[in-house]
A protein has these predicted regions:
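Surface-exposed helix-capping loop/turn segments at secondary-structure junctions
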Residues: 37-44, 96-98, 148-155
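Short, function-defining helix-loop hinge/capping sites that tune catalysis or transport
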Residues: 92-96, 142
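N-terminal low-structure segments adjacent to metalloprotease catalytic domains
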Residues: 1-2, 91
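A structural signal for well-ordered alpha-helical segments within the folded catalytic domains
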Residues: 27, 76, 80, 84, ...
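Active-site scaffold of zinc-dependent metalloenzymes
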Residues: 42-77, 86-93
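Auxiliary, metal-adjacent structural segments of Zn-dependent hydrolase domains
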Residues: 2-61
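Active-site oxyanion-binding pockets that recognize sulfate/phosphate
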Residues: 19, 72, 76, 127
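Metalloprotease/metallohydrolase-associated module, dominated by Zn2+-dependent proteases
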Residues: 100-172
Length: 172
C-alpha cells in the first residue's frame, strides 16, 4: 500500500504543484460544506475551482458550487463563499419546494426573479447588494461563521454591516 506522501508525489507529477494545492484546499473545505449543508438541511454539493470573475457561484440546475482559485486557496474567504452559496441553494430549494414556513419565501422569489431578468452576477451595484436574497446570504454567512466557528466577519461598508446585524437580529 502506498503512503500518502507517495500518492501526493504521484499527483504532483501528474497534475502539478498548483493543482495539488487546490485539491488540498478543497479537501480541507469538505467538513465546512458538510456542516453548513446539515445545518440548512439541504443536500451537500460538490465544490470545484474554475476561472470565474466573481468570488463564487452556484449552479442550481447542475447542483454544484464554483470557487475562483484565489478564493479556494484562502480558507477564510472560501468558508465565507461556501456558506453564502449554500444559503442561496437553501433559498432556491425553499421556492422550488414551496417551503411556506420560511418567512422570507416571497422575498426569495422576488430576488430570484430579479436575477433571472438581470443576470445572476454581482455587478457591484447597490441594486445587487440590496436584494433580499443577497442580504440574507451575507447575513447568514456572518451568523453561521460566528455561531459555529467563532469567526467574526465584516463587510467593508460599515452601513451594510449594520443592515446585516439588524437582519440577523430579526431573522436568526
Amino acid at each position: 500500500m502506498k503512503s500518502k506522501e507517495q500518492i501526493d508525489k504521484k499527483f504532483i507529477e501528474a497534475f502539478g504543484e498548483e493543482q495539488f494545492k487546490i485539491q488540498e484546499a478543497l479537501n480541507a473545505l469538505d467538513p465546512i460544506s458538510k456542516e453548513v449543508a446539515e445545518y440548512l438541511e439541504v443536500p451537500e454539493l460538490p465544490i470545484v475551482v474554475e476561472p470565474i470573475p466573481e468570488d463564487s457561484r452556484i449552479y442550481y440546475k447542475e447542483e454544484f458550487i464554483v470557487l475562483r482559485k484565489d478564493i479556494a486557496l484562502n480558507k477564510l474567504e472560501a468558508m465565507k463563499s461556501i456558506v453564502h452559496e449554500y444559503r442561496h441553494y437553501y433559498q432556491f430549494l425553499c421556492i422550488k419546494n414551496a417551503k411556506y414556513e420560511e418567512p422570507l419565501l416571497e422575498h426569495y422569489a422576488e430576488g430570484f426573479q430579479y436575477m433571472i431578468e438581470h443576470g445572476n452576477k454581482n455587478d457591484g451595484t447597490d441594486d445587487y447588494y440590496s436584494l433580499i436574497i443577497e442580504i440574507d446570504a451575507f447575513a447568514f454567512q456572518r451568523y453561521f461563521l460566528k455561531e459555529v466557528y467563532g469567526i467574526e466577519t465584516h463587510y467593508p461598508n460599515e452601513e451594510y454591516d449594520k443592515i446585516l446585524d439588524k437582519f440577523i437580529e430579526n431573522f436568526y
